[in-house]
Amino acid sequence: MEKLRSGFISIIGRPNVGKSTLMNQLIGKKVAIMSDKPQTTRNRIVGVLNAPKGQAIFLDTPGIHKPKHKLGEIMVTTARKTLGEVDLILYVVDASEEPGGGEQFISQMLKDIKTPVFLVVNKMDTVSREEGLKKISQYSQMVAWQELIPVSAKEKTNLDRLKDLIFAKLPEGPLYYPAGSFTDQPERQLMAEMIREKVLHATREEIPHSVAVIIEHLQETPKGGMVVHATIFTERDSQKGILIGKGGSLLKEVGQKARQEIEALLGTSIYLELWVKVKKDWRQRPDVLRSFGFDEKME
């Protein structure tokens, strides 16, 4: 009988290359929020793939970029810390983009890491075959890789092949998480991220990056439902007004869409109560970052 294989895989790449979409598709569950805004992922998120061959534990890390504020520094530190602690690195690049300074920076960083690297060329569905082959050639010369896999996370193209290669590389060993687990994130964090995702989709410019969501209180109802009290923090009064919208229209839209996903997560009906508050320049304030769950010492 074939022995089980289990291990940890870090998914890295510059912002907006599709890392969260890739992880969600690989495990078949939505554990990381998705947006076309760069730097959507802020913490290291764990997603667990359970398969007959064993268990693959994915760490979806923040996109590696040049930080512009204290939160950005924490995000990049979080991404870099995982690289020497895992069994495998999936370095995700975007087939629709030319390699640039971000890829050069990451490739240089990987030279000092002994962990095996799979180069995953994502978004192959967005380019022609000729252009895709050109990008594969360009990216393949930038980093020492053990496997090179062109995929489309959005269309689920070549993901089964990627899974097979991942399990072939993982060490033999027992399951790290109970069978059936798909993430280590608490429900409160999942709910907060679902709300933040809807804010990202509904806003533009600086507002998406200026928002933090905290679940303040959960209360069960006599009929078995749940009341969820959440606060959306932003940095300026002008942003607060935009987030609320005319007559509360934008906040209502965010709440309606987030409620549907939270109900699917909890398996029960919920009443979602959203508040918007200003916490001036919170991304630059270590005390506020710690209270929001961001910390340089985060694993």
Swiss-Prot record:
Please list where the region (G1) is annotated. 13-20
- Membrane topology per record: Peripheral membrane protein
| Entry keyword RNA-binding | yes
In what residue span(s) does the KH type-2 domain sit?
A: 203-280
**Region G2: start and end of each range?**
39-43
**For the region G3, what residue ranges are annotated?**
60-63
Record's Gene Ontology CC terms? cytosol; plasma membrane
Region span, G4: 122-125
Is Nucleotidyltransferase set as a keyword in this record? no
Which NCBIfam families does the UniProt record give?
era (TIGR00436), PRK00089.1 (NF000908), small_GTP (TIGR00231)
Under the heading HAMAP family, the entry gives: GTPase_Era (MF_00367)
UniProt function note: An essential GTPase that binds both GDP and GTP, with rapid nucleotide exchange. Plays a role in 16S rRNA processing and 30S ribosomal subunit biogenesis and possibly also in cell cycle regulation and energy metabolism.
Give the similarity note.
Answer: Belongs to the TRAFAC class TrmE-Era-EngA-EngB-Septin-like GTPase superfamily. Era GTPase family.
Protein name, UniProt field: GTPase Era
